[in-house]
UniProtKB/Swiss-Prot annotation:
<dbReference type="InterPro" id="IPR036237">
    <property type="entry name" value="Xyl_isomerase-like_sf"/>
</dbReference>
<dbReference type="InterPro" id="IPR050312">
    <property type="entry name" value="IolE/XylAMocC-like"/>
</dbReference>
<dbReference type="Pfam" id="PF01261">
    <property type="entry name" value="AP_endonuc_2"/>
</dbReference>
<dbReference type="InterPro" id="IPR013022">
    <property type="entry name" value="Xyl_isomerase-like_TIM-brl"/>
</dbReference>
<protein>
    <recommendedName>
        <fullName>Uncharacterized protein YihM</fullName>
    </recommendedName>
</protein>
Amino acid sequence: MVTINNARKILQRVDTLPLYLHAYAFHLNMRLERVLPADLLDIASENNLRGVKIHVLDGERFSLGNMDDKELSAFGDKARRLNLDIHIETSASDKASIDEAVAIALKTGASSVRFYPRYEGNLRDVLSIIANDIAYVRETYQDSGLTFTIEQHEDLKSHELVSLVKESEMESLSLLFDFANMINANEHPIDALKTMAPHITQVHIKDALIVKEPGGLGHKACISGQGDMPFKALLTHLICLGDDEPQVTAYGLEEEVDYYAPAFRFEDEDDNPWIPYRQMSETPLPENHLLDARLRKEKEDAINQINHVRNVLQQIKQEANHLLNH
């Protein structure tokens, strides 16, 4: 909510918000190699975005993970020519995954690496493994010049992630806040944001419908503006984080229509619940005769989200202006 207290902060920041194209917005096209990593740079540039967030596997045979050093360097060179920042993402926190993501980040000139854990086991055991993974990141890469974010990704609660970051004592580690992933941990967006707020530096923007499951909640991602997420309120809170300077340095535009994630945490769980193993995020492909239309729609949805987010930002700006001038 825009208030007199935060209206000036909003007006100072809203027009220069660092929006990043997120590769998952083109997930189906990239799985079928219709959109490739270099194409994301062109799309980001054409839409006047600050940079791209791309997974090491996006683009399948043509992914960053399959590029040689020369190709990675060329990708980084193209980004710099277009004045775009690069963030690298990986969907694990183990040594091999981190090493791969960091190597790609350094070879492309990226500034940041996102990871999230995917372990099975009782909560305390899982948190211990993750803490060890983070210790490896700190000991090996804290002087790499990269920043690191751990994303809240459906299975851990906000306070658990905050504890991991605080206990790591790693200055270059912070939290990436996703608009919907807390739902699956049986939390709600504004509550999760308030808990994580002191440690959030990056964001994934999307919308989703909350799906009630026995004892818990799932989410089905949808077109931004058509879901249950408090879209404008979340953006307003995030813009205002940081006193003198904006705390959030990257907002990833992650439209992911039709992605579904089930409940992972439940109302009746004990204090050391079982955390099930989860696969990497994936949106189902349609049947062949529907494929071309679905791929076209995915591209349209991605561009429409950019426009929707900018429209919401202008609404927030207008509310701030109105408050200060009346």
